[in-house]
């Protein structure tokens, strides 16, 4: 049993207008203080380019912490970070935990299956009780789009909220670590052609990446996939849509592959995984259509032989494992920035 964005227990709330690219609950910008500083990180949509660049610049300073003998800085000493994962996660939850620990915070991972929400307590009651325990920062993953917004709206004034993925809406720290990875290898966003390939309809990563890429001035963003897996509204965002993988990959500098999110699909949107790979899988032959120095990315988890060939995933143009490494520094930067901004 999960808790919907109204605080009631039951099935996850449906995303507002799921076939469209934008979501109805995004009113104003609750992420920013009155002074325009970042209090919560809920979505990349609506963030000024200056804040996105500030996060990336700060992350660059934290990358070197990994190479130190003592991999800690005292930035969040005395602060309490609560990881509230209402959806299963390994990679994201672990990197947030590592990032908070390296900032010297006290970290608590809430066991959702054993928590009061599984016994009928509302989401807001749970949040209020945790706030009373003097939590400073909530890292939230939830099946319902908008749940982190609800928490940010109702939590205690001193508490900060970071969205670690909500429904199919947004995954802002993944989008930011993807931007950091691209900047690390390509430097200048204003000269790039970036392709996002696969199940874009159900992907919160794709939404965050597209908002980040357009915010940072990428002149050409391509969405490539079958018609059944592309949302409406992409063209209005300035995204070029391709329904042929070979055509879409021609000359691109960055390829971001996405997995099929079968757990979010209703009905038969696709043939078998084998047939999908034949048409939409990234093989060495298809990679050769991109720019010679193109990089290949994937937010994980990765399904070899479905959306990507092992030769590509493990090849010299793949930067997938580096995304994971950079993710720790990016999440350190986000937590350090939001916890230092209060209104």
From Swiss-Prot:
GO biological process terms on file: 'de novo' pyrimidine nucleobase biosynthetic process; 'de novo' UMP biosynthetic process; amino acid metabolic process
Q: Which residues bind carbamoyl phosphate?
A: 91-92, 141, 171, 174, 300-301
Q: Work out whether the entry's keyword set contains Acetylation.
A: no
Family stated for the protein in its record:
Belongs to the aspartate/ornithine carbamoyltransferase superfamily. ATCase family.
Q: How does it assemble?
A: Heterododecamer (2C3:3R2) of six catalytic PyrB chains organized as two trimers (C3), and six regulatory PyrI chains organized as three dimers (R2).
Print the keywords alphabetically: Pyrimidine biosynthesis, Transferase
Quote the Pfam families the UniProt record gives: OTCace, OTCace_N
> What's one GO MF term for it?
aspartate carbamoyltransferase activity
Q: Which organism is it from?
A: Burkholderia vietnamiensis (strain G4 / LMG 22486)
List the InterPro entries hit by this protein, alphabetically.
Asp/Orn_carbamoyltranf_P-bd, Asp/Orn_carbamoylTrfase, Asp/Orn_carbamoylTrfase_sf, Asp_carbamoyltransf, Asp_carbamoyltransf_Asp/Orn-bd
One GO cellular component, as annotated? cytosol
**HAMAP family found in the cross-reference section:** Asp_carb_tr
> Which gene is this protein's source?
pyrB
For this protein, the Enzyme Commission number is 2.1.3.2
Query: Which pathway does the UniProt entry assign to this protein?
Result: Pyrimidine metabolism; UMP biosynthesis via de novo pathway; (S)-dihydroorotate from bicarbonate: step 2/3
Q: Where are the transmembrane segments?
A: none
Q: Which reaction does it catalyse?
A: carbamoyl phosphate + L-aspartate = N-carbamoyl-L-aspartate + phosphate + H(+)
Give the function comment from the record.
Answer: Catalyzes the condensation of carbamoyl phosphate and aspartate to form carbamoyl aspartate and inorganic phosphate, the committed step in the de novo pyrimidine nucleotide biosynthesis pathway.
Q: Binding of L-aspartate: at which residues? A: 119, 204, 259
List the NCBIfam families. Answer: asp_carb_tr (TIGR00670), PRK00856.1 (NF002032)
What is the protein's given name?
Aspartate carbamoyltransferase catalytic subunit
């Amino acid at each position: 049993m999960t808790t919907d964005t109204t605080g009631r227990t039951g099935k996850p709330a449906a995303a507002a207008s799921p076939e469209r690219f934008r979501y109805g609950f995004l009113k104003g910008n609750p992420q920013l203080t009155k002074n325009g500083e970042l209090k919560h990180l809920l979505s990349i949509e609506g963030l000024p380019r200056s804040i996105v660049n500030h996060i990336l610049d700060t992350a660059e300073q934290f990358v070197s912490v990994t190479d130190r003998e003592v991999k800690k800085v005292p930035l969040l000493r005395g602060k309490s970070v609560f990881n509230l994962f209402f959806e299963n996660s390994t990679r994201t939850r672990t990197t947030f935990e590592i990032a908070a620990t390296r900032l010297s915070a006290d970290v608590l991972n809430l066991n959702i299956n054993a928590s009061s929400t599984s016994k009928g307590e509302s989401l807001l009651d749970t949040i209020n009780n945790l706030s009373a325990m003097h939590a400073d920062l909530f890292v939230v993953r939830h099946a319902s789009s908008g749940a982190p917004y609800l928490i940010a709206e109702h939590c205690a004034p001193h508490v900060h909220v970071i969205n670690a993925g909500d429904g199919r809406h947004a995954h802002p720290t993944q989008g930011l670590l993807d931007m950091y990875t691209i900047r690390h290898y390509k430097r200048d966003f204003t000269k790039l052609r970036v392709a996002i390939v696969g199940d874009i309809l159900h992907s919160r990563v794709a939404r965050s990446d597209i908002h980040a890429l357009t915010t940072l001035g990428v002149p050409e963003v391509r969405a490539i996939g079958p018609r059944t897996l592309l949302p409406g509204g992409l063209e209005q965002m300035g995204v070029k849509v391709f329904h042929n993988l070979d055509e879409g990959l021609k000359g691109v500098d960055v390829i971001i592959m996405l997995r099929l999110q079968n757990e979010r699909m209703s009905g038969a949107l696709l043939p078998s995984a084998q047939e999908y790979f034949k048409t939409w899988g990234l093989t060495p032959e298809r990679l050769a259509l991109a720019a010679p120095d193109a990089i290949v990315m994937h937010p994980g988890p990765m399904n070899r032989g479905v959306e990507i060939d092992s030769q590509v995933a493990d090849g010299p143009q793949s930067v997938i494992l580096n995304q994971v490494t950079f993710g720790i520094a990016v999440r350190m930067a986000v937590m350090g920035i939001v916890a230092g901004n209060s209104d």
